């Protein structure tokens, strides 16, 4: 089968032939319908990115996948052969990951795609929606508090705006002027130029890092999305960062909320798996709204 890898000596992804995997007792084997390409994939595909994650000779790429279950391990009771599922590979370093013809995932990392959700589009949801949901959890009690979501037009930021609103936060999205219509469609306020020290909390979808603290009142809360690059605290601000972890029940809920329209499903485009390098170049150029998907 084919798998997208980062290889030594290459700064773009390589599509290579690898053996067909076999499901372990707690795993499911998925025939891929689509796999998303995220900015983190583009970073890891480069020499600098490989070094940052201590990659070996072969490093599989991809976090999100949707597809049909071909086989299940003998300990799996929640997923059946034939189910159409979406899932997240939350192990940063692995020889074969989500961008492949066939994908192995632990059963607790996948959820059945609900009726009404396009199975291909479902591949755009797991990583970014789970990251946003778990980041909102870290913000604490929303009662009477204001939140600025940076990068509100992006994938994590867009989900975070909607999820924080539904959790009870008074939300303002910070983004480009072209993002205003999308952000306001969630019921949140929008700004392209946020006021300093005006918010109780910041969820940093744009990865502003230290710069993002400037928008927070003394004693507020900052939640970042780069756990490997901690932000030094100041002015009594509580600083933390989300490290996404698999959560099948939460993913099922997020997929359901995508069907109802509460969470927007945004796909920038699809391309064959063989054209991974072209898609990586598009994602690496920045400014994408929605995820590019690789299809076998």
Describe each model-derived feature in a short phrase:
Residues 64, 83-84, 102, 146, ...:
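Residue-level marker of beta-strand positions
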Residues 172, 182-240:
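Glycine-rich cofactor phosphate-binding loops and adjacent beta1-alpha1 units
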Residues 251-296:
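C-terminal hydrophobic helical "lid"/dimerization subdomain
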Residues 19-37, 49-91:
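Glycine-rich beta-strand-centered segment in the early N-terminal region that forms part
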Residues 78, 87-151:
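NAD(P)H dinucleotide-binding glycine-rich loop of Rossmann-like/cofactor-binding domains
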């Amino acid at each position: 089968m084919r798998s997208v890898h980062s290889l030594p000596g290459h700064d773009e992804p390589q599509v290579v032939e690898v053996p067909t995997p076999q499901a372990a007792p707690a795993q499911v084997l998925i025939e891929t319908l689509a796999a998303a390409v995220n900015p983190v994939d583009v970073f890891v595909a480069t020499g600098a990115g490989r070094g940052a994650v201590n990659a070996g000779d072969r490093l599989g790429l991809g976090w999100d996948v949707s597809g049909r279950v071909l086989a299940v391990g003998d300990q799996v009771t929640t997923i059946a052969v034939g189910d159409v599922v979406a899932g997240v590979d939350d192990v940063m370093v692995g020889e074969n990951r989500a961008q492949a013809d066939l994908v192995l995932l632990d059963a607790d990392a996948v959820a059945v795609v609900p009726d009404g959700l396009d199975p291909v589009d479902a591949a755009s949801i797991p990583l970014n929606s789970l990251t946003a949901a778990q980041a909102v959890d870290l913000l604490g009690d929303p009662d009477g508090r204001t939140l600025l979501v940076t990068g509100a037009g992006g994938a994590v930021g867009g989900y975070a705006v909607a999820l924080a609103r539904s959790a009870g936060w008074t939300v303002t999205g910070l983004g480009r002027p072209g993002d205003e219509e999308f952000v306001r469609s969630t019921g949140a306020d929008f700004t392209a130029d946020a006021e300093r020290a005006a918010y109780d909390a910041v969820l940093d979808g744009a990865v502003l890092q230290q710069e993002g603290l400037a928008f927070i009142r003394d004693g507020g809360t900052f939640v970042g999305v780069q756990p490997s690059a901690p932000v030094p605290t100041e002015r009594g601000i509580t600083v933390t960062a989300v490290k996404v972890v698999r959560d099948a029940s939460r993913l099922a809920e997020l997929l359901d909320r995508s069907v109802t329209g509460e969470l927007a499903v945004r796909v920038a485009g699809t391309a064959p798996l063989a054209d991974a390098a072209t898609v990586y170049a598009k994602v690496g150029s920045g400014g994408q709204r929605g995820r590019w998907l690789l299809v076998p």
